[in-house]
């Protein structure tokens, strides 16, 4: 007979696409609105790799306001059409809205005294643009700890972010 599984003492969540709406939806929306072939932006991000604008922004090396110029460079490198990195980043940040069912689940876990953590790839804002920061402030009471790639200088899937 199978042994009963013990209740967890802690649960780790990603934010984008789990607790918050997915940034991938915002990327797809940007492509659709601008008549860009589907998956173009993901190809640019992938081809640029760890030295590309997106990876650098997620490590906090450049802010959301500094993203547009290096992203345009990444687009040129892979032969993609010119893309408005500022508009793209705005859509991504606007997509950072909570998923009500996940907020409810987090509340249940907290009420059950189960530790909760968030591990997220995010971006460093600058004064006057606190959309993602505001989302984090609103979520803070639901987590014992939030680990942010832009603060740690390392992003998922790099194993160092897990230690």
Language-model features: where?
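Short beta-strand/turn micro-motifs composed of small residues
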Residues: 120
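Substrate-recognition "cap/lid" segment bordering the active-site pocket of phosphatases
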Residues: 124-163
